[in-house]
Amino acid sequence: MADRGVDLAALPKEVREQLAELELELSEGDITQKGYEKKRAKLLAPFVPQTQNVDVSILSTDSTSSPITIPIAAPRQHRAHRSGGTRDDRYRSDIHTEAVQAALARHKEEKMALPMPTKRRSAFVQSPAENCTPPDTSSASEDEGSLRRRQAAISAMLAQNLQSPEYWINRSVQGSSTSSSASSTLSHGDGKTHNHNNHSQGQTSALADVLAHTRIDTNSSSGSVPPDVTSTAPQDRNSRVDLPANIAVKGISRGQSRSSMMDTAGGVPAHSRVSTKIQQLLNTLKRPKRPPLSEFFLDDSEEIVEVPQPDPNTPRPEGRQIIPVKGEPLGVVSNWPPALQAALARWGATQAKSPALTALDITGKPLYTLTYGKLWSRSLKLAYTLLNKLGTKNEPVLKPGDRVALVYPNSDPGMFWVAFYGCLLAEVIPVPIEVPLSRKDAGSQQIGFLLGSCGVGLALTSEVCLKGLPKTPNGEIMQFKGWPRLKWVVTDTKYLTKPSKDWQPHIPTANTDTAYIEYKASKEGTVMGVAVSKISMLTHCQALTQACNYCEGETLVNVLDFKKDSGLWHGVLTSVMNRIHTISVPYAVMKACPLSWVQRVHVHKARVALVKCRDLHWAMMAHRDQKDTNLSSLRMLIVADGANPWSVSSCDAFLNVFQSHGLKPEMICPCASSPEAMTVAIRRPGAPGTPLPARAILSMAGLSHGVIRVNTEDKNSALTVQDVGHVMPGALMCIVKPDGPPMLCKTDEIGEIVLNSRAGGTMYYGLPGVTKNTFEVIPVNSGGTPIGDVPFTRTGLLGFVGPGSLVFVVGKIEGLLSVSGRRHNADDLVATALAVEPVKTVYRGRIAVFSVTVFYDERVVIVAEQRPDANEEDSFQWMSRVLQAIDSIHQVGLYCLALVPANTLPKTPLGGIHVSETKHHFLEGSLHPCNILMCPHTCVTNLPKPRQKQPVGVGPASIMVGNLVAGKRIAQASGRDLGLIDDQEQSRKHQFLSEALQWRAQTDPDHVLYMLLNAKGVAVSTATCSQLHKRAEKITAALLERGGINTGDNVVLLYPPGIDLIASFYGCLYAGCIPVTVRPPHPQNLSATLPTVRMIIDVSKAACILTTQTLMKTLRSKEAAASVNVKTWPNIIDTDDLPRKRPASIYKPPTAEMLAYLDFSVSTTGMLTGVKMSHSAVNALCRSIKLQCELYSSRQIAICMDPYCGLGFVLWCLSSVYSGHQSILIPPMELETSLPLWLSTLSQYKIRDTFCSYSVMELCTKGLGTQTEALKARNVNLSCVRSCVVIAEERPRLALTQSFSKLFKDLGLSPRAVSTAFGSRVNLAICLQGTAGPDPSTVYVDMKSLRHDRVRLVERGAPQSLPLMESGTMLPGVRVIIVNPETKGPLGDSHLGEIWVNSPHNASGYYTIYGEESLQADHFNTRLSFGDTETLWARTGYLGFVKRTELLDASGDRHDALFVVGSLDETLELRGLRYHPIDIETSVSRAHRSIAESAVFTWTNLLVVVVELSGSEQEALDLVPLVTNVVLKEHHLIVGVVVIVDPGVIPINSRGEKQRMHLRDSFLADQLDPIYVAYNM
């Protein structure tokens, strides 16, 4: 250090004081280590011997690292002191530190390899020092800041290159974290695994990089970027590019699709970086937990889980019942005043020159002294002004008994004294509060609650303070958050009026009227006003006078806040009663000169000093063997927070240093107090030389069970407590159980101290309900009978009565954390955390411990401020060791340990941490941690036992018979019968769509079938019947001529959404080919989208590709060659300029069972499936839709969705040709440039029926939600819309459809218009809300029963209920039945099972290469095992149920509604229960406003939650605990890994469905570039 060679003792006093102040700033975290060294060097520079030719500012503390040797002459004490320079010894106990080290040593043997969280590299570089507000006294210069930034960048670089987190975790995987691989299993034999290295030199976060590194082998169609047949849109929420994964082709792999993917982890080799971490996490989780499994309880009734029953071996209290303890009688002294104001009047008249108060300036020098005469005269003026000069004579603003707020800074005691006594004299009730510093102070809203509950309308303040209050731009005082409107009155002397001669204040004898109100914050942060009556105030002063033996004319040094607690009781009230001279040392002076109070004691020969442990600690730190310090005048050093169990170490350490300066051990007097009961107990000063009272050394394990056991076995978990003396004079004290009825404790039991005394608070002002429970407690004995009728007041202190009636306090109710039936004190946990060395990670004074209720128990959370210079690895090491230490010493698991950037925790007015506000920030996700460690697996031990599936002894037949006997009908439903509906339309004669088009071209050539709109809403192309027919013929000719195509060949159609696609489809039918529509690759993102195209072409064995010129160029471009082998494309035919040729003949299939087209789609589980659609199925489907939606030539419909697969393709390409209606086509990508396009089209063309996808609906809801007024102004009117159907293959998204309906209700949209369709791979259209059926109904099911594969219907609003909407009306010709997927037996009404469908438009099978029909048979042609065993059904793979409703359908029968719950393939099986990802995701998305989207999947039984963050990156870590909490609370699952990513990372297919398996593969292959990955322990 710079002071080597400097004799500190010889330095001038001012320099020594400045050095002490610096030390203090460093210890409090107000200045960085660098800033400290720089400022210190500057101070010492003039005193460094000149021979040392060294720049003092950059000398290293560690002399070994510096080549320069410096003569070391610094005094020894200083060096020793430096090591503790950053310590806050309030929580310091050498014994405790030793204990923690021992506990950690025990853990070392079983080295715990916790996986370190992964931060995005960019996030690593941002040192928390940069993104936090500078500490309040920091003045680091700019060059230092830039140096710091540079160093942060360098260290981050080093962290990456030398010791990445992985290096620390597992050195055996060195080098492997940079390579990752992905493989794809293709059904046609190309199953080789391709391994390439992904170089990590420039790991930037840009997507471009991720894409540039995708490895697609030249001869393989496996892409690291997962194909989706469907999406062309750029990276945007609506319909996004599908990102990496391995697609398995559905066909032969169908049967093993899910299990095989789970086993092989999606083809990701085990040495991927992510996999290693997850493996580690699993290993960590395999370690035995507490409690053992036998203590888990069963969740049989499925009711709410209960906390486990306590262990029979827990220690129980064994002593006799406690007897109330009486304080000494309160003596009556003849000259005690009848009221406190009378004392002031007496001294003001008889001792006017006697000093009452001395205030200090910022340097600690006396600023002014207020005499008793001045105090009396000014208080009198103020009282007169308040009562007579604020309003008019007839309408005064204030009347006696009104409440007024006192707003004075801590540095101005004089103004406060005058205001307080002025109010007492005027008989208005003062309510002292803190000075508000900003509109959003920590706890400001609660102060507003206090002012409101006390009915305060007026605030007194000083001129200086008023000027400093935050103002609005026009100069008015700001309206503080939650505050009532206040009138502000300035009380400086120049504004006060001298009372008229005849005016005298009314000073009655002290009675039970309220004298003043003191504020108190509860554990939850609620601020209430404790009302103190005039008689209580006076009695309390008398009791303190007797206990402390105050004498007239003594001097008292008060370091405490004079607005409340002991600072007010001793320093403002009792001192005036006894004509004491008070020297008030403000907080600001203490920060600047921590020794100032000691110097004041010395200078003024003070007899009493009033301090807190913090002041002892600061003074001790700043002390440098000053010659001019003598404390022998003190007869009492009152330690106001002596009730803090850790105060004993501060007292001992202070005595250690100052005993040589005249401090006598018997003068240290700890006391215990609470806002409600005021002073509870205080140690009286002992006679000189008397031995100090003995300490209690208690077992922490005993304390956690609420019993007193002297610690014998393990010194590591002991708590040493000092007494707080005897109970106050005139008081009666009991100890009662802290929860439940106030039963008296036993002698060896810890309980809450309750006090009966005339000297306590009387009520919470304005809150009678809460008052009763606190101020009117009547203790009962073990039999439950009251011990008397005197009411006691709860103190909020936990303790016991020791030998000799000494009171011991071991904690406070508000710091109590009750976890699994055991009690832990927050302060004890803080002490343990801080005893974990090295504490170079966090600031000692800035740590908050609280509990949050998650899953029916309290969970412990620790939040600390991280030093800006702490690195990731040190922080993580420290955090891991804190977990171990707390586990060893307190036997309690930590739920969450979070580090936040320096100076960001909310502060109390005097610099402490505002714990309730911190907890509030934690729970609302606004704490912004820079490091977090969650351990739910360790501490959540009350989960219900995993469900064991019992073998069902009853067969399907018995179940069915049972249902029938019970009067339950079999769960089946059907649409209208196709055969019975007479369809006179001419097209009925045509079995094939190709014939229907020819017939339409002949009979109605100019009828417009299709109109395609662009972003401006202009029709860019139209197609009449004859135009479409002619264009199809041209394409047929080209196919036969150029393509060399044979009948039955597959042809890929690669077109953007439009009319070309439709013409090419019919061109293929005319040529006898099988069309396969494929979504074209996205030109800006070929590497992600082209492999899918390639895969479909390969899997379908396409003979040629029909496409546009632009797309043909793209397929053959250099960019494409980077992703796929462009030399092996099949024949590509561009259809832009075709010659006018007609084919010789048009093909007519010999039977309607022949294939019409193939429908390929990527499922949400990443499976590519192609299904075969025959001509008869196409015909039946078009007919069914025509009848359901009443489509005929004069109708117009609008379609805004992708036309590549499923029902979307049928509506876009087939339906109009069959039914003759006009379809207005709106490509969804046009909405990106013009959001209102779809809605304005509906309005402009007065469309009655429209079809869209969820992506489109979501885009409109999010993008146009705020623009309804603008749309109205443009005359957009949706009242014409009769049905708006969302085409989907999933459970209806009720929240989205409802918000869409609500948002656009203002534009005339009928709330009944919006409905959903449901289709699957085996049947593209099962339900579609038509014109005839009843409106879709909604039911509420219990989520817990769904997990058990049961349906329990509940009322709307029931807890854990899930709303499900019917998926539209069954199409004509469709029958569904609900079947048990395992037994294949039919189920009863309202039972959950797989939906099976029978319909003439079922697909005829999966398109496979090897023709393995056995697998398909199971899905497309399967029979029930009992009941109707003849009918052939297709299995949809979706779970759902049928419920008969009260509504009537078109035929007049009761309507059977089908409710889809979700895809079987997608469900997650966890803890023996079945979960639907969407349910967990819905909960997650509600957890925080910055969660844009989420997706969940499992990996080796761990639940992984991926969350898209829409806010700033500093919010990333806020999400981790919130996501963990919500999933635990609502789904009873522990999240294993939380991954925070950028918006748009979760891949979505064209139907707007999340592709969770792609996401999973990308995550495991380390391709997501996450912002943060948290591994929950």
Curated annotation (Swiss-Prot):
Glycoprotein keyword on record: no
One Gene Ontology term of the biological-process aspect is: negative regulation of axon extension
Q: Name one Pfam family in it.
A: DMAP_binding
Show the ranges annotated as biased composition (Polar residues): 124-140, 217-236
Q: Where is this region: Disordered?
A: 109-148, 173-204, 217-239, 253-273
Q: Which organism is it from?
A: Danio rerio (Zebrafish)
Which stretches make up the DMAP1-binding domain?
A: 7-124
* Family that this chain belongs to: Belongs to the DIP2 family.
Q: Cellular component terms, GO, for this chain's entry?
A: axon; dendrite; perikaryon
PANTHER family in alphabetical order: DISCO-INTERACTING PROTEIN 2 DIP2 -RELATED, DISCO-INTERACTING PROTEIN 2 HOMOLOG B-A
Cellular compartment(s): Cell projection, Dendrite; Cell projection, Axon; Perikaryon
- Where composition is biased (Low complexity), the residues are 176-187
Which keywords annotate this record?
Answer: Cell projection, Neurogenesis
User: What is the designated name of this protein?
Assistant: Disco-interacting protein 2 homolog B-A
> What does the protein in this record do?
Negatively regulates axonal outgrowth and is essential for normal synaptic transmission. Not required for regulation of axon polarity. Promotes acetylation of alpha-tubulin.
Q: What superkingdom heads the lineage?
A: Eukaryota
Give the SMART domains listed for this entry: DMAP_binding (SM01137)
